[in-house]
């Protein structure tokens, strides 16, 4: 894609553009589970749990539906992840208001496992490898509807 304008003959350096992507994954945020190991016939075999595979597929699908281009982010990347957990239906109206305005979600899954499930799912789709993520912010909080908001941006130093 060229950003050079026919009307304005000034050359524009496309390398100065910061590319970004944002999307939401509906449903309860999910932390990446550890690989499982089974032994059969004296051989150990590691596999990824079914729930982790399903969630990573859901992340990929949400990304592809929200981002209308095939461009992969390049260079160092900043990632912001907001994991929103639904307020339990059993709490009172007053407690619900307090949770929504004053309190973060402090139960499992851990922030690092939430980030791992999102970032691993986006390997080779949004960027070549999640090792490109140099800056990471993850927050867990209560909300009306369970979902995970993700914002990725190339880090450019001018």
Predicted regions span which residues?
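Acidic, proline/glycine-enriched N-terminal capping motif
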Residues: 2-158
């Amino acid at each position: 894609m060229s950003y050079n304008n026919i009307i304005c003959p000034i050359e524009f350096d496309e390398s100065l553009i910061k590319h970004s992507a944002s999307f939401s994954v509906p449903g309860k945020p999910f932390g990446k589970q550890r690989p499982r190991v089974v032994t059969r016939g004296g051989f150990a075999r590691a596999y990824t749990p079914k729930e982790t595979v399903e969630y990573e597929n859901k992340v990929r699908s949400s990304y592809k539906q929200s981002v209308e281009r095939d461009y992969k982010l390049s260079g160092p990347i900043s990632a912001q992840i907001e994991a929103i957990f639904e307020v339990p239906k059993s709490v009172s109206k007053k407690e619900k208001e307090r949770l929504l305005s004053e309190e973060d979600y402090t139960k499992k899954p851990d922030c690092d496992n939430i980030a791992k499930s999102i970032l691993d799912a986006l390997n080779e789709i949004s960027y070549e490898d999640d090792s490109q993520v140099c800056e990471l912010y993850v927050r867990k909080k209560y909300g009306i509807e369970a979902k995970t908001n993700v914002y990725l941006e190339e880090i450019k130093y001018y």
